Amino acid sequence: MNVNQTRTFRLAYSSCPNDTFIFKAIARQLIDLNGIGFDIHIDDVEALNQAAVKVTHDITKLSFAALGNLLDRYALLRSGAALGNGCGPLLVSRPGCSFQDTGGRRLTVAVPGMGTTAYHLFRFFMADRFPEVDFTIHPMSFEKIMPAVADQRADFGLIIHEGRFVYPAMGLVQIADLGQWWEDKTGLPIPLGCIAVRRDLGLETACHIQTLIRRGVDHAFAHPDQGADYIRQHAQEMEDQVIRQHIDLYVNDFSKDLGNTGEQAVTAFFAYARKTGMIPDTDLPLFAC
């Protein structure tokens, strides 16, 4: 394809402030898109993971864990990702709950989807720290997890995104920081979410889209207040301070370009997932360009 010809691509990402911050320049056309159009769809990450199984979107936000099972259809872009330190999922519960004193009862854990990176980190963590504990998984939308734990419909909850900042207000306590566990284990940042592109779009198109996303990140860093209403529009009634915390935690230099350290982190995550049988082996290249 000649990338200078006008063409519209289906672009999907989440309503979370880190994604809307990264893509606001594209969504509001605050940068030159060079004749490329985007039909934008916004949904939660697990819904996007499921949509990618059917290759619903041309460019899509995915959890790294989901991408590991979709490499026959999608390849990874080096821009737009969420990696970082101190920003991994938290395992929370009500005060007094623990894995050490289960009374032989099978525990219930609410998670933001089976295909999420958070769930994979939970499985890695449990195999490493509590291999003897039995648990039942209840997948649900991330915004429903804390209420489920608070209302005793689940013993534990795996929380992501803005949940990191608000769980104490719901009377919940942290049981484990799975991001910290990963960092201690590997010495690398936590691979959380990524932007992937359909393999059949070809190298030239993939690289062009990657460049646009990188320029969008640059614009967002340089002009953080432009398009702020777009972020707020999708922020699920978050307070401005929580939105700012969210962006500061999940958007960083890795969002512009993974670089060597980011590549090492992603490679380590996939190696760990393959070793534990959670994603298949493949000879396909990981990166689109």
Predicted features and spans:
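Beta->alpha turn/N-cap motifs
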Residues: D44-E46, V55-G68, S141-F142, I159-F165
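A local structural motif
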Residues: I31-H41, M126-M140, I279-L284
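Bilobed "Venus flytrap"/periplasmic-binding protein-like clamshell domains
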Residues: N4-R28, P89-F156, I160-E162, Q264
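Secondary-structure end/capping motifs
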Residues: G202-Y272
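Hydrophobic/proline-rich hinge and linker segments of small-molecule sensing/allosteric domains
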Residues: L76-F99, E183-D200
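Extracytoplasmic small-molecule ligand-binding "clamshell" domains
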Residues: N18-I22, I31-S63
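A structural signal for short loop-to-beta-strand junctions that line the ligand-binding cleft
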Residues: F9-R10, R73-A81, T108-V109
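Pocket-lining segment of extracytoplasmic ligand-binding domains
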Residues: M140-Q233
